């Protein structure tokens, strides 16, 4: 996982850059720095990145209040409102307990001129809070409705803000997380706190109330110590000694939520390990806070229930059209992504989607919905303007954010009272002596580009402006300069101390000593003498920024060599061995997984989330172990001091390691707690350990308890989040499978697939000048016939619930799935007498007329005894092997068969996976029983015993039936797709993705079936198959396929004529060795008639010569002379007979010919046809020629013996002659011995006999070998 540069070191070192809430001394005297920068700054992100990519951490727990609301109305609003306070020593997290720390007098604050605003929350906060309420009270819908009624009453001004707080507190009694979460939507000055005794404290402007079970009762409370502080601030605690300041309390684990919605902050981490990003949400919430609504007076934000009601209105309006709602979300998310890109680019990026385009797309989406469109316009006030970054600027002008989402005030441009610095000098402010007059509200907010540096510099002093100009020129990067200004912004907001500011800007100004010294003098900063003895860390960080590593020497892809001109930093602790073996030349440039161009190698969002959890867990562990190591060292010192006398204790001193082995570890542990005062604490430990060690040790142990308690809470959150995303992180294919599979299952994609294969064959044949190869274009397999029943059951289940399909069509579909398809696939037929549909399928008969009632204007369904798709010939082939079925289909039938095969294949894969898991489970239990001697139940696995996994409601043996039930529930809409996918992942892990689109697949199949039973051409295709099936032209055994070639050719011609306007596919279902193979071939049905006159003349001449048996073309004579296709002796006999007939006709002897023809029966009805496009001759079915002599069989029996002996004598005479010439007597004798098995060694013991027999009137020698019993050697 890609780590930040500052995270690659131990988190202990990062503590120097972070402000610890428990330490407040550093804020007692601080200056403000005014930079001549544009008045709009980008939100301060978690890390501030310089121009070269080096990033610097910002304190994660700081949260500075926004400008309070000046409106007279106080009530819940979508805004992240916190108390205005100049010393953010206490942070009130959402859902956490009150955090207290030292209180210090606040400097006077000048009144803010003009209308004041508070930061607006996104609509996700409201939606997530509603989702949490809905989840909490899932079994009590009335509570959720009452909450919405309270919000509506407040909107109508029926109740005030205290009334809302009282009613919400009573409604959510017993749920402190919901009550505390409601603080997010309260105006400034109001705060709700839940006590341990279930009492609710409500802080209102001026006093604090307690809400008992019956309402609000004012309770006397001490007045606030600081009038300038809003009363929502926690009561200050008495001041404590400086060496032991009070640290911020960490939220208790009971307040940590198992599933943190987007609207709630993750429980506040200590300053060591704050989660850097919210958890990945499976469903992105709706965000419609695109701009400031012009219809809301005084620039009020969009109200809580206004946004909720609008979103709910869209959901309800398009309840039957979920695609519109999804498209609406997609438009908003695309717009927000563009705005984020524009914000990150700093004004150098033009969004591809403007507000005008957003409004236009929503207008097209909400056509004829004027009320929704007009209401949406409230969220896009500048839809008709051309401001590039209106939304981004509006958010930036209001505030900048730290990494916890807290609101940080914008730098004020009005005069502030000057405060004396530590060295007595004063910091000059903007010119002017009084408050500036109110600024009139402009119709549009200025964009970032409209505010120039020159305008901003008018408010600065010449020396300061000159300094910032030098800094901008020295940094030579706009991004680095903006990061430098961000440091000043958060210092002006008193988020960081002066020392931390100097440390943050040192990477920018460290390599410019003159500017850096001027800046430190301007701040009045003096380095502490106690810290001079410690080595400076990262002193050469600025130097690394000047090196151009792209031009340096490379070693592989991960290392760069430092240039020779680079001056190595001095190191006094190196030995000669260190100088010999340590690397000072090569710098590591690793290749991160996120930088890969291959999508398959990148981590998914769920993997990234788990990696972040592990990073946070690691950082927290490092901090805890560092603190524990320091505790052990100090305990050892305390034990040693207890054995010393008072005089020895007074003389006892510690070195820089504080009694341990490392200077850095213990110093970082103390700096994490005492912050700026850590140097004094360390100095006290070294000089006076007898007094300082017990105090510091007590402090460390207290923090150890707090952090351990926080760790337990975080472990719960991390565990739940890991469980939520663990299975998704393993599934790499499921993320993109749904989107890609939807495209694959489209009818157009299936047709394009086979058409592209057909075109490739045609092009290949054209290039090679060869004939087009004949054969199937696709070959698909049906591996298991049992799956056909499950596929048919799912399809019929969905068909039953389709109101758009007529009852008669449903019955036809049922017959196709239970009878017709199994017959094609040589499978067992299904049962049509479904008990579930007995009453539904029965014909409703009118009692008066006795005629079947009509449904939707169509006659009742046919009786069950009538089978519309009877295929008796195919049924006979079911139990045979090496058989086939032939089916010529159109587009709809082809698409249906493709989808049906995909469905069966996926069901088989899920079924096979379930069987494998059953086998693994059985093997594991068998191994535990035999090897470990443990016999456990099915639901008693080690993971469940250790509470690492929740017990499943379904046994492994029931996974496949449970999967089928879930598919039915998904088709019926009883479960949503996310719940369905999560359940599948839990059962089948990474193999579940193949079934994510099962509902879409079945719906596509049902649509094709509806076409098959209702479309005229599809019905004719089916009828043609059934008719040809009766003629024996649709299949049979493979070894007799040639005998049916004429019938199949006729079937093909009829199918091509029927489907002349669309594709014609030849489907062959071949059963071999128990498996069924489906082959698909796209036929060419286009006839291309030749217009060449030469070809036409040759064709006419060919037909004429063929019809006349007297003449033959010269080409044919020449071809027959070279390669005759008949026996020449037959030709001689025919010619001899012809000459004999001609001679008899001349002599007038007609009696013999008539007598010869009397005993002969003949038929001459053979017909043929020619295909004009290919000149191919095709014989007509049931036309034939034959000739038969009545006495031919009798005469053959009578002459059989004579003919057989004559032929044998002729053959024997030829053999004897050849043997006499080529075979000597010795060879003939050897042959006789070999036949009798004599004179050969190594033969199995046997006896050979020779008997003479007569076969077909001829004597033959019959040799018989009889083997003896073979005894094997022991």
Curated annotation (Swiss-Prot):
Region named Interaction with SAP30: 459-526
Chain positions covered by the region annotation Interactions with SUDS3 and SAP130: 525-660
Result after altering residue 329 to A: Greatly reduced binding to MAD
Region (Disordered): 1-26, 85-110, 205-297, 398-443, 835-865, 1137-1157
Region (Interaction with REST): 205-479
Tissue expr: Widely expressed. Highest levels in testis, lung and thymus. Expressed at relatively high levels throughout brain development. In adult mice, expression is high in neurogenic regions such as the subventricular zone, rostral migratory stream, olfactory bulb and dentate gyrus.
Phenotypic consequence of gene deletion: SIN3A knockdown causes a significant decrease in the amount of cortical progenitors in the proliferative zone at the peak of neurogenesis, and results in altered neuronal identity and aberrant corticocortical projections.
Keywords recorded for this protein, A-Z: Acetylation, Biological rhythms, Coiled coil, Isopeptide bond, Nucleus, Phosphoprotein, Repeat, Repressor, Transcription, Transcription regulation, Ubl conjugation
PTM comment, free text: SUMO1 sumoylated by TOPORS. Probably desumoylated by SENP2.
Effect ascribed to mutating residue 307 to V: Greatly reduced binding to MAD
Positions of the UniProt region annotated as Interactions with HDAC1 and ARID4B: 688-830
Location within or outside the cell: Nucleus; Nucleus, Nucleolus
N6-acetyllysine carried by residues: 470, 866, 876
Sequence ranges of Acidic residues compositional bias: 835-847
SMART domains, per database record: HDAC_interact
SUPFAM superfamilies recorded: PAH2 domain
Cross-link position per record: Glycyl lysine isopeptide (Lys-Gly) (interchain with G-Cter in SUMO2): 122, 134, 564
Region: Interaction with HCFC1, residue numbers: 119-196
A GO BP entry: positive regulation of neuron differentiation
Annotated ranges, domain PAH: 119-189, 300-383, 457-526
Any Pfam family: Sin3_corepress
Composition skew (Polar residues), residue ranges: 252-266, 284-297, 412-425
Record text on subunit structure and interactions: Interacts with ARID4B, BRMS1L, HCFC1, HDAC1, HDAC2, MXI1, SAP30L, SAP130, SFPQ and TOPORS. Interacts with OGT (via TPRs 1-6); the interaction mediates transcriptional repression in parallel with histone deacetylase. Interacts with BAZ2A, MXD1, MXD3, MXD4, MBD2, DACH1, NCOR1, NR4A2, REST, RLIM, SAP30, SETDB1, SMYD2, and SUDS3. Interacts with PHF12 in a complex composed of HDAC1, PHF12 and SAP30. Interacts with TET1; the interaction recruits SIN3A to gene promoters. The large PER complex involved in the histone deacetylation is composed of at least HDAC1, PER2, SFPQ and SIN3A.
Protein role: Acts as a transcriptional repressor. Corepressor for REST. Interacts with MXI1 to repress MYC responsive genes and antagonize MYC oncogenic activities. Also interacts with MXD1-MAX heterodimers to repress transcription by tethering SIN3A to DNA. Acts cooperatively with OGT to repress transcription in parallel with histone deacetylation. Involved in the control of the circadian rhythms. Required for the transcriptional repression of circadian target genes, such as PER1, mediated by the large PER complex through histone deacetylation.
Protein name, entry field: Paired amphipathic helix protein Sin3a
Organism: Mus musculus (Mouse)
Higher taxonomy: Eukaryota, Metazoa, Chordata, Craniata, Vertebrata
Gene: Sin3a
